[in-house]
């Protein structure tokens, strides 16, 4: 094992594991194994209304049937309120966040007006200077202006990336109006506390990465290496998800789905001859992954 490498797969328990999720799980698992590292599973169950009872246990059981068992006990976001609160308090003390009283309608109206004026569609910073008599609803992280707003990073699959937080995003929410923690804060705190060094996930989250890197800088925590794999889409070109009718994986015969997931990732996991066991598949797939993303040699 390489104690310096720590990766993770972070599903939301909104339903059973489907093929699109399998691609993400497989990519993160292969990267961890190719590097001789530790692979974790984090259950992202913060969104109470969307969480399906029993779905998390079903996801973990399906992963086990497919030969992917985490190296440490799963992490549950729903148990980590104190960690998120402590992070927000640090940002408040540093003057980096502010309460926001804007409703969704007010923000939508501002963005619509900006669109009509052909100006930025980012959150306009209405509450930066105060609530103006409105009750506090959410907490936002203040993003910098000018050149300091540009976050660049090199993605291991998607290559050079750049985003101007001021013009493309605006001050973003860390705690929502309904009291729930926002995805960006929870992910950054969880990755830091778990010592995650490598994040492998779907390209639908590529747009979130610059925000997470900026938040990591604000909290003074390390930035992992990022790799965003192509997402699986349905016949209409929509991301395959539970919301678009993705069906649960068949546990009885994992190999066909694993081969299809490897093919989606551009891996010739069978090599010159077909493999007939899960162990043989993973050995071949890990070698194929390492040839692209290293460093299994030795």
Curated annotation (Swiss-Prot):
A motif ('HIGH' region) lies at residues 11-21. Binds 1 zinc ion per subunit. One of its GO terms (cellular component) is cytosol. GO terms for molecular function: ATP binding; glutamate-tRNA ligase activity; zinc ion binding. Zn(2+) binds at residues 100, 102, 123, 127. Keywords: Aminoacyl-tRNA synthetase, ATP-binding, Ligase, Metal-binding, Nucleotide-binding, Zinc. Its EC number is 6.1.1.-. A motif ('KMSKS' region) lies at residues 239-243. GO terms for biological process: glutamyl-tRNA aminoacylation; tRNA modification. Its cofactor is Zn(2+). ATP binds at residue 242. Pfam families: tRNA-synt_1c. InterPro entries: Glu-Q_tRNA(Asp)_Synthase, Glu/Gln-tRNA-synth, Glu/Gln-tRNA-synth_Ib_cat-dom, GluQ/Sye, Rossmann-like_a/b/a_fold. L-glutamate binds at residues 8-12, 44, 183, 201. Belongs to the class-I aminoacyl-tRNA synthetase family. GluQ subfamily. Catalyzes the tRNA-independent activation of glutamate in presence of ATP and the subsequent transfer of glutamate onto a tRNA(Asp). Glutamate is transferred on the 2-amino-5-(4,5-dihydroxy-2-cyclopenten-1-yl) moiety of the queuosine in the wobble position of the QUC anticodon. This is Glutamyl-Q tRNA(Asp) synthetase. The gene is gluQ.
């Amino acid at each position: 094992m390489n104690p310096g490498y720590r990766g993770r797969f972070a599903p939301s328990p909104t339903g059973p594991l489907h093929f699109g999720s399998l691609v993400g799980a497989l990519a993160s698992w292969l990267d961890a194994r190719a590097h001789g590292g530790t692979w974790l599973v984090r259950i992202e169950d913060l969104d109470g209304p969307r969480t399906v009872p029993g779905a998390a246990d079903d996801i973990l059981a399906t992963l086990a049937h497919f030969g992917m068992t985490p190296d440490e006990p799963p992490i549950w976001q729903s148990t980590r309120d104190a960690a998120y609160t402590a992070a927000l308090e640090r940002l408040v003390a540093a003057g980096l966040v502010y309460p926001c009283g804007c409703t969704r309608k007010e923000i939508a109206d501002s963005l619509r007006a900006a669109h009509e004026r052909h100006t930025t569609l980012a959150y306009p910073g209405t509450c930066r200077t105060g609530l103006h008599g409105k009750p506090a609803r959410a907490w936002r992280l203040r993003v910098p202006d000018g050149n300091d707003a540009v976050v660049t990073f090199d993605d291991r699959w998607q290559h050079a990336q750049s985003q101007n937080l001021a013009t493309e995003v605006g001050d973003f929410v860390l705690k929502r109006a309904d009291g729930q923690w926002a995805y960006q804060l929870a992910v950054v705190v969880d990755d830091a506390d778990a010592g995650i060094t490598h994040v492998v996930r779907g390209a639908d989250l590529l747009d979130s990465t610059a925000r997470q890197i900026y938040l990591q800088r604000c909290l003074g925590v390390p930035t992992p290496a990022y790799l965003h794999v192509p997402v699986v889409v349905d016949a209409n070109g929509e991301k395959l998800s539970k919301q678009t009718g993705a069906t649960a994986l068949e546990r009885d015969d994992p190999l066909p789905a694993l081969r299809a997931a490897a093919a989606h990732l551009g891996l010739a996991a069978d090599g010159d001859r077909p493999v007939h066991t899960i162990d043989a598949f993973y050995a071949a797939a890990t070698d194929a992954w390492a040839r692209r993303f290293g460093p299994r040699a030795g």
